[in-house]
Amino acid sequence: MVAIHKPAHDVILKPVVSEKSYAASDRGQYTFVVAPDANKVQIKQAIEEIFKVKVTNVNTLNRAGKKQRTRTGFGQRASQKRAIVTVAEGQTIDIFGN
């Protein structure tokens, strides 16, 4: 399957900054919120283009939005797609400002 080229900043929306993703950065894994229609090949190409690192593995997951109670009834948070990207040994991505 050939990936349709999208601009890198349309594929990678933002990094996930949390304690869990910070701990995973010690293992060379970084978590990003990505476009819902992005595939693993597009995510790999975008990370390599933006951060100039070698990506060895990409895992993706779809997080369903939670139902939220509002004043007028129920609503729902937006669903999002995340990618956990593993970079080559010895390479890092500075998304935590270290």
Curated annotation (Swiss-Prot):
GO biological process: translation
Alphabetized UniProt keyword annotations: Ribonucleoprotein, Ribosomal protein, RNA-binding, rRNA-binding
An annotated GO cellular component: ribonucleoprotein complex
Keyword Ribonucleoprotein belongs to the record: yes
Disulfide bridge map: none
MF annotations from Gene Ontology: rRNA binding; structural constituent of ribosome
Pfam families for the chain: Ribosomal_L23
Quaternary data: Part of the 50S ribosomal subunit. Contacts protein L29, and trigger factor when it is bound to the ribosome.
Family the UniProt entry places it in: Belongs to the universal ribosomal protein uL23 family.
Function field: One of the early assembly proteins it binds 23S rRNA. One of the proteins that surrounds the polypeptide exit tunnel on the outside of the ribosome. Forms the main docking site for trigger factor binding to the ribosome.
NCBIfam families membership: PRK05738.1-3, PRK05738.2-4, PRK05738.2-5
Protein name in the entry: Large ribosomal subunit protein uL23
Native species: Bifidobacterium longum (strain NCC 2705)
